[in-house]
Amino acid sequence: MSTYTRPVMLLLSGLLLLTLAIAVLNTLVPLWLAQEHMSTWQVGVVSSSYFTGNLVGTLLTGYVIKRIGFNRSYYLASFIFAAGCAGLGLMIGFWSWLAWRFVAGIGCAMIWVVVESALMCSGTSRNRGRLLAAYMMVYYVGTFLGQLLVSKVSTELMSVLPWVTGLTLAGILPLLFTHVLNQQAENHDSTSITSMLKLRQARLGVNGCIISGIVLGSLYGLMPLYLNHKGVSNASIGFWMAVLVSAGILGQWPIGRLADKFGRLLVLRVQVFVVILGSIAMLSQAAMAPALFILGAAGFTLYPVAMAWACEKVEHHQLVAMNQALLLSYTVGSLLGPSFTAMLMQNFSDNLLFIMIASVSFIYLLMLLRNAGHTPKPVAHV
């Protein structure tokens, strides 16, 4: 059976449109708040409201999928996010935007859980690595194109909201032409997220998602600050961030393919080791382009491989709950990692960014090496 079936391709097509809208709003909302002369702490609180919505959406989506299936859950998530977009134009103010960004955060997380769970349920242990690699490629390409749109079109609030909301609703259209089967057996009891987090044989995958959140959250949030403190111009910062993200895009498919062929344990070990090497290269003031490229190629591909590892350890009817647990783990890592790293950078040195990334990666590498004898190795498929 083909890996990229018609439902998968249509699902990813819709996701691309949604990711464009998400990327544009995530970039412009802080700028719009600043234009309204809101203080830094207010901008931060609105941002936190969005991520709080992410957590709530992640926890709710499993129940929604079980009740109404993948297609209707996807439609509902898209409508919720569209409401969060349109609501920003109803009233401009701190409390209003706090509420609407919370709504948008719920919708955004629901979209992620629905798409990731649908891909997991559509695939097998032979091709889940490639499916998740395709998902991450679409996500990063959409994010990149969203940034490009921001630089090319008017960024006025009432100019952006109509087409961003329209883009979100257009993301529903591809799913109208297919039906993504929810193959969770109805005679199975609901699986709790907590039980998935405690599942011993999937712990390396869960830990990998936490580490991935720490690494990517720190790179996304603090790399521009690191470069700025090094005297790099804003234009050049954009270039170096593009190098980082492009490496992540280019690395998705080959690493997903290798994980499917040679087993996820081996690939995870190599990835984490390369992240450590990339961090050391940045600390040693080596050529920035190759250092950032290998850091991006390895760091940005940790999440899908760790997710595929965890999902092959559970029964088919547990996949949605496991995916919720993994996304929750990633979100927690992406929230805590940058906060802790930023405090270290402020109090000691900017180099703590890469020391932190290398340190958590080294801890995860030790887990991968130590648990090899206790955790069954994923079966390699030619």
UniProtKB/Swiss-Prot annotation:
Presence of keyword Cytoplasm: no
Keywords, sorted A to Z: Cell inner membrane, Cell membrane, Membrane, Transmembrane, Transmembrane helix, Transport
CC per GO annotation: plasma membrane
Main location (coarse class): membrane
One GO MF term attached to the UniProt entry: transmembrane transporter activity
InterPro entries for the chain: MFS (IPR011701), MFS_dom (IPR020846), MFS_trans_sf (IPR036259), MFS_YcaD (IPR023745), MFS_YcaD-like (IPR047200)
Cellular localisation: Cell inner membrane
Cytoplasmic side: 1-13, 66-78, 123-130, 178-203, 256-269, 312-324, 369-382
Membrane-spanning residues: 14-34, 45-65, 79-99, 102-122, 131-151, 157-177, 204-224, 235-255, 270-290, 291-311, 325-345, 348-368
Residue ranges annotated as Periplasmic topological domain: 35-44, 100-101, 152-156, 225-234, 346-347
UniProt membrane topology term: Multi-pass membrane protein
Source species, domain of life: Bacteria
Stated family: Belongs to the major facilitator superfamily. YcaD (TC 2.A.1.26) family.
Alphabetized NCBIfam families for the sequence: PRK03633.1
Name used for this protein in its record: Uncharacterized MFS-type transporter YcaD
Classification lineage: Bacteria, Pseudomonadati, Pseudomonadota, Gammaproteobacteria, Enterobacterales
Gene that this polypeptide is encoded by: ycaD
